[in-house]
Regions:
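Acidic, low-complexity, intrinsically disordered peripheral segments
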Residues: 283-349
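Residue-level recognition of short, well-ordered coil/turn positions
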Residues: 47, 121, 264-265, 304
């Protein structure tokens, strides 16, 4: 059940990642398309060279191809979620902008490892398998030992016959025999062609393999607990850093737009600024999803990923409140048209 919860959660956030990626790339495509229109207008009035138009066109085509790939990725992730849950979802809740970033409690990596080694369901299953394998060895060894069986039986006979006693014949005499037996049977195995010894060796090897499985499972559980704990800790810092990076890229795009309008920044600079903002948006969203999955993975390692824990995480999600810092849509740059008497610069083709 705990593994299923994590599988569903991972597939769920994969869908959200695909949605956010598609949304960001579509926004970028729209902005780049506007930039291409503006570049074409500026080229027509002689303000820029044809290279700026070609750069914008190439960026527009690349963005369009990216959107097509994003749609395919979104459809695939939705199908994977539907495969697990058996349901098709029109809308999924996303983390709100005020989603809490909570440190693990207890805030001690070694304590989480101890809890995991004690409660991890996979490790517990491995230990039970080893115990069963050990008992099977005892059963196989018992094939060499004498055995005592208690056999009990009862027979009842009834018939009718004629009997002659001292010259007198009696017809229809009933004969009844009621017999009871209890027997102790001792069986001493002498030689069975090596069958019993082979069964013992097989059981012993299976027991050894089961014990090795416990060791391997213990190591994997410890690694999973440490990795998930560090994933939560680093995930908090990662989300905070990427949120700041998102705001910085928004500011950088505004500055680049202003520079492009007055001619101090090129169209390539503007395209790069847009790409950086789109990447920052996607990275911020993915980091938050990764943080939530790390929280659930840590709970899985500790064997505490249950319905109440899932309900608690579900309170972080919303379908109405903003899910990311406000990103202002870049203003459309109006082409600067020179006065009628201004000299027209030569266009380089």
């Amino acid at each position: 059940q705990q593994q299923l919860i994590l599988r569903v959660a991972t597939a769920y956030f994969n869908v959200l990642t695909a949605e956010d990626t598609l949304e960001a790339d579509q926004t970028a495509l729209e902005a780049i398309s506007r930039q291409l229109d503006q570049a074409t207008t500026r080229f027509d009035v002689g303000l820029i060279a044809i290279t700026d138009v070609e750069d914008a066109k190439a960026a527009r085509d690349t963005a369009a191809a990216t959107v097509i790939a994003d749609k395919r990725a979104l459809a695939t992730s939705e199908d994977q979620l539907q495969e697990i849950t058996g349901e098709k979802y029109d809308r999924l809740a996303k983390p709100g902008i005020d989603m809490p970033l909570l440190n693990p409690e207890p805030a001690d990596e070694s304590r989480w490892v101890d809890i995991s080694l004690e409660q991890n369901p996979t490790l517990i299953s491995s230990r039970l398998a080893a115990d069963i394998a050990r008992d099977n060895v005892r059963v196989a060894v018992g094939g060499h030992l004498p055995s005592i069986d208690i056999l009990a039986g009862r027979s009842y006979t009834y018939n009718t016959s004629d009997e002659t006693v001292e010259g007198l014949t009696f017809n229809g005499v009933d004969n009844k025999i009621n017999d009871r037996q209890i027997t102790l049977q001792l069986t001493v195995p002498l030689f069975a062609g090596g069958y019993t010894q082979s069964k013992v060796r097989q059981a012993q090897y299976l027991w050894i393999a089961a014990k090795e499985g416990v060791v391997q499972s213990s190591r994997a559980t410890e690694r999973q607990a440490r990795d998930a704990y560090l994933g939560v800790i680093s995930g908090i810092a990662h989300v905070q850093a990427l949120r700041q990076a998102l705001e910085s890229n928004q500011t950088a795009l505004k500055a680049t737009e202003a520079g492009y309008e007055v001619g101090t920044r090129t169209s390539v600079d503007l395209l790069n600024a847009r790409r950086n903002l789109v990447q920052a948006q996607t990275n911020f969203a993915v980091a938050r999803y990764d943080y939530i999955v790390s929280v659930l993975t840590l709970r899985l390692a500790a064997g505490t990923l249950d319905r109440p824990e899932l309900t608690s995480v579900n309170t972080w999600l919303t379908t109405s409140a903003p899910t990311s810092p406000a990103i202002e849509t870049p203003a459309t740059l109006a082409p600067t048209v020179p006065p009628a008497d201004a000299p027209k610069p030569q266009n380089r083709r």
